[in-house]
């Protein structure tokens, strides 16, 4: 079980609501044509991708309540941004109300639901709620890519920025919870690398637009974030991330990444509860001194990786390939 307390659920759900609101800010400026333009994403357009994020949150709330919907809301149900925002506000209130009274026993309660093709699945309430947030983060990354491809500028939804904005300030992370988060992150990153390993070099480095333009550079950024935070935990403050060309082929990048992942496994495996509540001080790329609670930095890193894996999926699909599925619940099924 990923979440063990109502406090932790409240933090993640409050972050998710904050991030969704920020995500929608630049969307308000797009034209009607851009709203529905098929740009080759997993769900075609901005409209389709936003509907999918909303629908994912809706269906997981229904399942956590013990229901088994047989279909998702569609673009026709949510034709405009105004309609989507109105329904989303009501949904977020419903999610908050559901989570507000959950006890540890209720978090651990298994829920069995029937999916859209008639197959039964069972997960705990805690894992369902974590997947709800993780799924939204993944597709917010895709929205950022689509906005840039439409010559728009997305807004940052980094987890640590949520704390800067006045979000929950009291950490409550257990070493076991963090170890499971990092096991998921490693599993997901390796699945992504395997899925792109056969992409030709010319496609791997082809500029298709997005936050980092190419698939190679997006993966290099994803790796670089893992690397730079590990450096910061070692007391160093690098002044830049590795460039895309330095990352090399997917096979070379995987070798480098496995070394970083081993470093994270050792660090997280040795965490004591009191360490998760300490501050990590470092200097960012601009030379500014910053500090955040260790536990929340680690959650930020995994959330950031999920976000950029969503971007990798969009670029992979736009290159005519099938992206890897990295849902948290899929990892549980494979365990």
Mark where each language-model region is:
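Carboxylate-rich helix-loop segments that flank metal/cofactor sites and access channels
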Residues: 104-116, 273-285
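Helix-adjacent hinge/juxtasegments
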Residues: 67-107, 236-276
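Intrinsic disorder/low-complexity detector
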Residues: 173-174
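Short, contiguous alpha-helical
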Residues: 6, 10-25, 32-74, 116-170, ...
